[in-house]
UniProtKB/Swiss-Prot annotation:
InterPro entries (alphabetical): Daa-tRNA_deacyls_DTD, DTD-like_sf
Documented EC number(s): 3.1.1.96
Domain notes: A Gly-cisPro motif from one monomer fits into the active site of the other monomer to allow specific chiral rejection of L-amino acids.
Name used for this protein in its record: D-aminoacyl-tRNA deacylase
Single GO BP term: D-amino acid catabolic process
PANTHER family in the cross-refs: D-AMINOACYL-TRNA DEACYLASE 1, D-TYROSYL-TRNA TYR DEACYLASE
Amino acid sequence: MIALIQRALSANVVVDGEVVGEIGPGLLILLGVEQQDTEQKAQRLCEKVLGYRIFGDENDKMNLNVKQAGGSVLVVSQFTLVADTQKGMRPSFSRGASPAEADRLYQYFVAQCREHGVKTETGLFAADMKVSLVNDGPVTFWLQI
């Protein structure tokens, strides 16, 4: 399971001209689900993402996690993160979980974020989404479990 996390001043997701998820300061989390992923991996990745200290403290040192910084998260499914790009000029998505399993684990990841007490917004699984982000920094990390 892969999470590409971006520290955001704001972010939103639009589907069919309608905003379906929106946050102020916090994290935009692009989530890719691989074939061998499990609920345990989703839980571990969620804990890592929410615990990752990439927000500035009183000395402007990256020392606070999203909850400590008072931020929220916007979780967006992103199957292209699991692409194999090593050969040729076209990505292969054979490592990706089936759509049903990817949706199940995506929803599980979202539920875990909410259980940790972090305000959590989402995109719409498998939809054609327009994602907007004001990246703060920019600060972007690739986390994989």
